[in-house]
């Protein structure tokens, strides 16, 4: 029986969407009794739980910071665990919209004009 960790929740403002997605994915995967599932959050015990469960795959359903910025990906790669999502470098670049735009422009990928908006502390 293959073990799969469903990584959901997290700290972004899209936390609830991540949890709803995790519930839906869990429901569907349970229909196929080939998998042993564990749903966890990226808390302080994440690596400990990961090592104990020894999954074949981590379904990364996190949004925003930690889930889409290369952070979780770097942990999973250091633990030699397969995961869904882009890799460390592509995630860390894509989360930065200005860098992404510059890469698109340099590679002649059509993209709408942009401007950088900086909030100054009052």
Report residues per predicted region.
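ATP-binding N-terminal substructure of ATP-dependent carboxylate-amine bond-forming enzymes
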Residues: 1-99, 106, 118-122
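Basic phosphate/pyrophosphate-binding loop/patch that engages nucleotide-derived ligands
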Residues: 103-111
């Amino acid at each position: 029986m293959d073990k799969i960790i469903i990584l959901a929740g997290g700290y972004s403002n899209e936390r609830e969407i991540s949890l709803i997605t995790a519930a839906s994915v869990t429901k569907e995967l349970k229909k196929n009794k080939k998998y042993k599932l564990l749903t966890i959050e990226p808390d302080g015990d994440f690596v400990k739980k990961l090592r104990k469960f020894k999954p074949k795959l981590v379904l990364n359903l996190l949004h925003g910071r930690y889930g889409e910025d290369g952070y979780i990906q770097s942990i999973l790669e250091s633990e030699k665990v397969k995961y869904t999502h882009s890799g460390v470098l592509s995630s860390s670049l894509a989360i930065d919209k200005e860098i992404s735009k510059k890469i698109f422009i340099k590679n002649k990928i059509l993209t709408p004009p942009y401007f950088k908006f900086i909030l100054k502390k009052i």
